[in-house]
Amino acid sequence: CGGTYSSEWFFSKILHCLRVDPDVFDAAYTWLECCDYIPAVLTDTRPDQVRRSRCAAGHKAMYNKQWQGLPSKEFLGELDAKLGELRDRLYEESYPAGVSAGRLSAEWAKKLGLPEGIAVSVAAFDAHLGAVGAGVEPGRVVKIIGTSTCDILVSPTGQELVDIPGICGIVDGSVLPGYYGLEAGQSAVGDIFNWYVKH
């Protein structure tokens, strides 16, 4: 849906690395979004066992269960053969926020002053969780404004959805369980405002 894919998103960043520093690309076993990396570090989870965020996977990596998860090896290989080869080292499943990513490790419990073994949630993006905090519900648009702006809506998963040109994705469970999360907006808003101030 939406018909767009940003240079800021998952596969664009990986492809950029492959083209500007192939040695780094070749040295990497897999790739993680920051929101997946932090819970993995806090829970001392191996890279091949990280529970990937549905929010990040769906909105930035084109993950959709109806399409067998991430884009196929063949699709990615059309962009670059090495990107296609990477597909097997990525992931098959994604999880909504609220699902356990694991338990807080002893090391991080000590550093943070928290009890060892408490649950650490699978992550979601700041705007999507901000929409939850702002009371997003069907029929209500929430606009999150910061370094970017995101317009977040939800629609029950039982409803048929139509293609909406220009949005950043429709992802099952990316905002609330049992709802599609719909995201639109403008990236780099804070940087653009800063540019205007300086110029």
Cite the ranges covered by each PLM segment.
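Gly/Ser/Thr-rich active-site cleft segment
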Residues: 2-124
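Catalytic phosphate/nucleotide-handling subdomain of diverse soluble enzymes
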Residues: 110, 114, 118, 123-199
